[in-house]
A protein has these predicted regions:
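Conserved histidines in hydrophobic membrane contexts and catalytic metal-binding motifs
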Residues: 1-346
């Protein structure tokens, strides 16, 4: 996207606008309030500091190593806490083996939230790391074939394939901001971006301007191209979320969609959105990766996402508990360092 334009607005909200120099597309529009919360949330959470983030390889390695070390520290702390508790269990099963205040509260918060701290650090590591091969079910050769086949199907079409003149589409509305020549499995269409919406127009017709959407026959053809005629599968129209197709309240996946259940070793499910022209694929490897990352990191679990209030309660409880656990750990670390410095000076 570089270079880009950055505009500063002289208004009370101190808006800032980022826009691409190539096509004028808006990348980001912020105000002082959103930037303030970004510095309290996303920036420290993802280590989005400009001096580091502009070096992508270094940033990825830093986050991976930090998350890995965090996993080891959390696991070691939980293990040592359990050991100390077991040695002092004669004091009572529900009593801390420590008497000093900071040690006691660090122990209690570690018992309650230590496991979640480990899974949070581990899932953060998984966000930038591929699943190890021993956890994957699909062979590498099959993954490469699937990727290369999809690239050939969605490759660029010749201009002649777009029978409908784009100027005819432009004449239908004054709100059109951009037209993109697109295709889905060799079927041409125009992606029309308006003020706040995106529409797909069938470009195979030379006369009428009509929406482009996926049909059942197009989906059947796509499934046969992917799996051949020897693999059995069935298709239905999904109007409610299932165990594989769902999302959080603000990121709910669109409905209805066509669901294809494939009878293969990977228990593959395909979800086709006929209006937005998109396909989602989920198999055993995808389910494992989703659990290891979004499931553990943001509680992206259907039982909780279907109950937003419960999701908020659980998430805020874990975040507050994890923050307190980290705070007590930092205090104890600072106290230990000060003791070492004082001892060294003597």
């Amino acid at each position: 996207e570089m270079p880009i334009y950055k505009y500063y607005f002289d208004d009370p909200e101190q808006h800032q606008l980022y826009m691409t120099s190539r096509d004028g597309r808006v990348l980001q529009f912020t105000d002082k309030n959103s930037r303030f919360w970004a510095w309290l949330g996303a920036i420290p959470h993802w280590v989005y500091f400009t001096s580091l983030r502009q070096h992508q390889t270094a940033w990825i390695e830093f986050v991976k190593w930090a998350a890995g070390i965090g996993c080891i520290m959390c696991f070691a702390g939980l293990w040592l806490g359990i050991q100390d508790w077991w040695k002092q269990r004669k004091l009572g099963y529900f009593r801390s083996p420590y008497r000093k205040s900071w040690y006691k509260w660090h122990f209690i918060s570690g018992v309650c939230f230590g496991l979640f701290a480990i899974t949070f650090a581990f899932s953060g590591l998984m966000s930038l790391t591929d699943m190890p091969d021993w956890m994957k079910k699909a062979p590498k050769e099959k993954q490469k074939q699937m990727f290369s086949g999809r690239f050939r199907q969605d490759s660029m079409l010749p201009v002649e394939a777009y029978a409908l003149d784009y100027r005819t589409v432009l004449s239908t509305s004054d709100s059109i901001k951009r037209i993109t020549w697109s295709s889905w499995r060799r079927n041409p269409y125009y992606k029309i971006r308006m003020n706040n919406t995106v529409q797909n127009i069938d470009s195979s017709d030379t006369i009428s301007v009509r929406p482009f959407r996926l049909t059942e026959e197009m989906i059947r053809m796509d499934v046969r191209q992917q799996f051949g005629d020897s693999v059995r599968w069935k298709m239905d129209l999904l109007s409610e979320y299932d165990a594989d197709y769902y999302g959080k309240k603000k990121e709910r996946n669109p409905l209805p969609v066509y669901r294809v259940i494939v009878d293969d070793d990977m228990h593959t499910h395909l979800y086709y959105d006929p209006e937005n022209i998109s396909q989602r694929r989920i198999d055993d490897d995808g389910r494992t990766r989703r659990f290891l990352y979004s499931g553990l990191h943001s509680l992206n679990i259907k039982y909780l996402t279907d109950r937003p209030i419960l999701w908020n309660i659980v998430m805020f409880t874990l975040m507050i508990g994890g923050t307190f656990l980290s705070l007590t750990g930092v205090v104890l670390s600072v106290k230990w360092i000060l003791r070492k410095i004082k001892k060294f000076r003597k």
